[in-house]
Amino acid sequence: MMYIRRLNDQTANQIAAGEVVERPASVVKELIENSIDAHASCIRVDILQGGAKQIRIQDDGDGIHPEDLVLALERHATSKIAKIDDLQDVTTLGFRGEALASISAVSRLTLTSRQKNAEMGYRISNISHKIMTPVPAAHPQGTTIDVQDLFYNTPARRKFLRSPATEFQHIRRIIERLALSHFTTEFLLHHNEKEIIHFKSATTISGQENRIKSILGDVFMQSALAIEFSQSGLTLKGYIAEAAYTRSQPDLQYIYVNGRFVRDKLIAQALRQAYHDVLFHGRHPAYVLYLEIDPAFVDINVHPTKHEVRFRDPQWVRDFLIHAVKTALAQTKPGIAHPLPQSTAEYNPITNFAPTPLIEGQGNLSLIQEQPAPYTQTIVHKHPLGHALAQLQGIYILSQNEKGLVIVDMHAAHERILYEKMKKQLAEVGLVMQSLLVPINLSLNPQEITAWQTNKALFARLGFEIESFGPDKIVVRRHPSLLKPKNLENLIRDVLADLITHNTTSRVGERINAVLATLACHAALRAPHYLTIEEMEALLREMEKTEHGGLCNHGRPTWKQFDIAELDTFFLRGQ
């Protein structure tokens, strides 16, 4: 028979340590956060053998009073909070009072500290799970914590450690994450007595950008858009990569809530949704973002590692993030290297839109608002995408701008233009409908019938008039005027297929945009389709004023620039 018994302190501490101390990087994170909370301006980290042998953290912070040294190594002892209500306003990185106790339970730990204006420092050690009496020790202002032989007394945990090189990479990533949210703090990292990282204090914008560049890379910063967006008590700052810069893995995604690095599914999904219209399948956006919110509206006491948060109103935060990032992404236009100025939080990327007819797929381009000026060398610079020269095999448009040659994918560009116009028309007046001379009868399978019955209102809003015609048939009487009747049956089946596979819990707006993307893809010009110079010119001008005109609805690029210098190098000119 199993009897309930009380665990001794040593066993309880080692079990608790398993929640906080997963690997050497966990130790580094907890100790650096303590240094930051102590207002350290410089933090040095020394690592031996990936942290399994030694982790040494030294800072120049406030230091610890000698009388508090013993308490510092005990569980549930903290200077950050005094009562449960204090959790509503926590602004420090640490507050649980568990880190030092958990670390000392699975290592040989020595803590030395001296406060400002104190005559000397004091040292305390945890030997054989016994906290020794503090003794005087020479030490500069600040605190040094020496952690040796991590998991020496828990062999099961120690054998799960990876190689020293792997463990060190985890430590490096922890320091980089902390360095990205505490720019005024200097960070030094040494491994096996070799300096690996030295982030100097960054008090200027250029200094902060240099630190970001050293961590996320030059290519990220070259494609980065600065964002600063405030609304309804929320503020989002930082940098997001242009839609053309994506990653095969979500490895360059840094999000901070009130200065704390978090991994939050709600935030990650919101940011991905903001990129939805421009993200190629299987690719991931890159960003470093800082969300500021009233501490009373977010709970950071969700998990011992404090990587997870819980918002009081998650939908409010989600909508804000999507709107903020979409607005920033909308600032760039084809051929423009830097974001356009953002005037207000309600910035509308499409302004002064002339109510000209929309493009009709596989028909004449109805883009031309006026006869374009004949091409001359003197006006090339006026248009980022230049002026049309010719068309290649009914697929690509060749254009010349002041930089050199531009090649445009006709279908991809037309698809994006149609998609953005559809969204705008739907939001303003709804999609215009047109009657079919001969209604189309469609036989559907059970899944398709269910999808249509569930989404009748959606089809009506998209400009379709469809009626039931028996248990497994429908009849299409009217369709959006944007679309040609040709292949209308295939289009409706594709839309139904999208709705069948689409998450039924998704919000209506997202579902509508997904269907509009399918409509635009079907309506866009398809190769081979030959255009006149005037039609090509009209397409280029529309691209320049279309939101996300540099990418199609699936995230593929719509155009490519070839600079004269690049061509000269290829043809060995001047060599």
Swiss-Prot record:
GO CC field: mismatch repair complex
InterPro entries the UniProt entry points to: DNA_mismatch_repair_CS (IPR014762), DNA_mismatch_repair_MutL (IPR020667), DNA_mismatch_S5_2-like (IPR013507), HATPase_C_sf (IPR036890), MutL/Mlh/PMS (IPR002099), MutL/Mlh/Pms-like (IPR038973), MutL_C (IPR014790), MutL_C_dimsub (IPR042120)
Molecular-function annotations in GO: ATP binding; ATP hydrolysis activity; ATP-dependent DNA damage sensor activity; mismatched DNA binding
Keyword DNA repair attached: yes
Keyword DNA repair: yes
A Gene Ontology BP annotation from the UniProt entry: mismatch repair
Keyword annotations: DNA damage, DNA repair
Entry-linked Gene3D superfamilies: 3.30.230.10, Histidine kinase-like ATPase, C-terminal domain (3.30.565.10), MutL, C-terminal domain, dimerisation subdomain (3.30.1540.20), MutL, C-terminal domain, regulatory subdomain (3.30.1370.100)
SMART domains: DNA_mis_repair, MutL_C
Pfam short name (any one): DNA_mis_repair
HAMAP family: DNA_mis_repair
Protein's job: This protein is involved in the repair of mismatches in DNA. It is required for dam-dependent methyl-directed DNA mismatch repair. May act as a 'molecular matchmaker', a protein that promotes the formation of a stable complex between two or more DNA-binding proteins in an ATP-dependent manner without itself being part of a final effector complex.
Name the record gives this protein: DNA mismatch repair protein MutL
Organism whose genome encodes this protein: Coxiella burnetii (strain CbuG_Q212) (Coxiella burnetii (strain Q212))
Lineage: Bacteria, Pseudomonadati, Pseudomonadota, Gammaproteobacteria, Legionellales
Gene: mutL
